Amino acid sequence: MHTGAFMSDQQDRIYATSHSQVGRFSFDDTVVRVFPDMIRRSVPGYPTIIDMIGVLAARYAQPDTCLYDLGCSLGAAATAMATLTGDTGNPIVAVDNSRAMIEQAENLLSQAGQAHRVTLQEGDVAEMAFNSCSMAVLNFTLQFIALEKRDALIRRLADATVPGGILVLSEKIRFANDAENALQTELHHAFKRNNGYSDLEISQKRNALENVLIPETLAAHETRLKKAGYRQIHVWFRCFNFVSLLAVR
């Protein structure tokens, strides 16, 4: 069953016309309206990642613990977790700091018949306290959090995760080797062009994300996870400069 990214009839044309000055990217009403199309055409393998988050939830959800979708956007990961854990009783908490995202997520969760399983919260995941959990998802979220706040967030998540519980961390990454970084970036741009984005759209979106999305190397993520107390760290998905890690507590 495909629970993946919520589909949308609205195509992302935000950067299709030339802007004299490109503003900083934000998850506002304009982005929310086209987000399903934007994420599908911009992130290689995004629907697969969402579906496999559901599969991982079915395997790792433990009794009397909650499941977190942190930086939930429209709640696709939370919906996948809810769908494949059935009525286990695990509370699922989905958090985002964008009011526009939360409001639309409420509508989509109702349409998916999962509103009763998922509690939506508007808030900053870098500042919130966590209850005992067996699974947390940071699906392309950490990259938007200030670098100086990332260590503490991952430590607090690890502390809240029960033994055998997991963190799914999906991120756009950079490479220490300049040549590899350039190649992987160009391959990602080729992916976007193949999905209908123009060079103008790719360039303006990249400018908008400058100093908003701050990628790190895979090694930096693995080091942070180990220091926080995760016992096993596995790369379970990778395409170009996008990866998803499975960290086991």
Swiss-Prot record:
Keyword S-adenosyl-L-methionine: yes
Cross-referenced CDD domains: AdoMet_MTases (cd02440)
A Pfam family that the UniProt record links to this protein: Methyltransf_25
InterPro entries (UniProt xref): CmoA (IPR005271), Methyltransf_25 (IPR041698), SAM-dependent_MTases_sf (IPR029063)
Key word S-adenosyl-L-methionine present: yes
Signal peptide: none
EC number: 2.1.3.-
Residues that, per the record, bind S-adenosyl-L-methionine: 46, 71-73, 96-97, 124-125, 139, 206
GO biological process, one term: tRNA wobble uridine modification
Keyword terms, alphabetized: S-adenosyl-L-methionine, Transferase
An example molecular function term from Gene Ontology annotations: carboxyl- or carbamoyltransferase activity
Reactions this protein catalyses: prephenate + S-adenosyl-L-methionine = carboxy-S-adenosyl-L-methionine + 3-phenylpyruvate + H2O
General function of this protein: Catalyzes the conversion of S-adenosyl-L-methionine (SAM) to carboxy-S-adenosyl-L-methionine (Cx-SAM).
UniProt protein name: Carboxy-S-adenosyl-L-methionine synthase
Gene: cmoA
